Curated annotation (Swiss-Prot):
Gene Ontology BP annotations: dopaminergic neuron differentiation; neuron projection development; response to unfolded protein
Protein name: Mesencephalic astrocyte-derived neurotrophic factor
Upper lineage: Eukaryota, Metazoa, Chordata, Craniata, Vertebrata
PANTHER family registered for this protein in UniProt: ARMET-LIKE PROTEIN (PTHR12990), MESENCEPHALIC ASTROCYTE-DERIVED NEUROTROPHIC FACTOR (PTHR12990:SF10)
Gene name, Swiss-Prot/TrEMBL: MANF
Modified-residue entries (Phosphotyrosine), positions: Y73
InterPro entries xrefs: ARMET-like, ARMET_C, ARMET_N, SAP_dom_sf
Similarity annotation: Belongs to the ARMET family.
Amino acid sequence: MWATHGLAVALALSVLPASRALRQGDCEVCISYLGRFYQDLKDRDVTFSPASIEKELIKFCREARGKENRLCYYIGATEDAATKIINEVSKPLSHHIPVEKICEKLKKKDSQICELKYDKQIDLSTVDLKKLRVKELKKILDDWGETCKGCAEKSDYIRKINELMPKYAPKAASSRTDL
């Protein structure tokens, strides 16, 4: 009898998560972005009240691109956001709660927040552009805020990237030998 109760308890404990703490690599976009935001607030000596933090976060999110913009959307800091959980960021941040803890709470509200991961950056100084897919070449241009109108073939995208590289990635452009 005791063995079955012990087995049931062991089974129940194994099913429940041992800790709700974030693992390494979890919420990387959330932690990074909110960390930069918090540091920006401290550097500019902004008043740490929930209302002022909320206003500043909305302003900060206007400049966000890519995954960071998606995070802003999830917390309700963009104009087109469906839900508003921005107070789940502004209130704890006003009490100087670490961003890791804030992201942990946000994960409980919306698990998508912690599923965001930064895209791997391509090292333009060493990569052979000819071996990349057209999709990856388009992404490089998109990350720079550029488009390639009239590009039909891979070689057109490579030419455009090589043309713009000194402007957007000067270190990579100077270290490349195939130009």
